[in-house]
């Protein structure tokens, strides 16, 4: 059986990257929460 996780840095960035987060209101909420929590890395 094929494994479900086939890593790709390009797909990772396009789906979970900074610009993708900034493109929606909820994505900006995600970034705000992660900043408030003090995360070292905000996005993938």
Curated annotation (Swiss-Prot):
* Native source organism of the sequence: Hyphomonas neptunium (strain ATCC 15444)
Q: Which PROSITE patterns match?
A: RIBOSOMAL_L34
Stretches with biased composition (Basic residues): 26-44
* GO function terms (MF aspect): structural constituent of ribosome
Family matches, as NCBIfam families:
rpmH_bact
Region described as Disordered: 1-44
* Any one GO cellular component localisation term in the record: ribonucleoprotein complex
Q: Which family does it belong to?
A: Belongs to the bacterial ribosomal protein bL34 family.
Keyword line: Ribonucleoprotein, Ribosomal protein
Q: What is this protein called?
A: Large ribosomal subunit protein bL34
At the top level, the lineage of the source is Bacteria
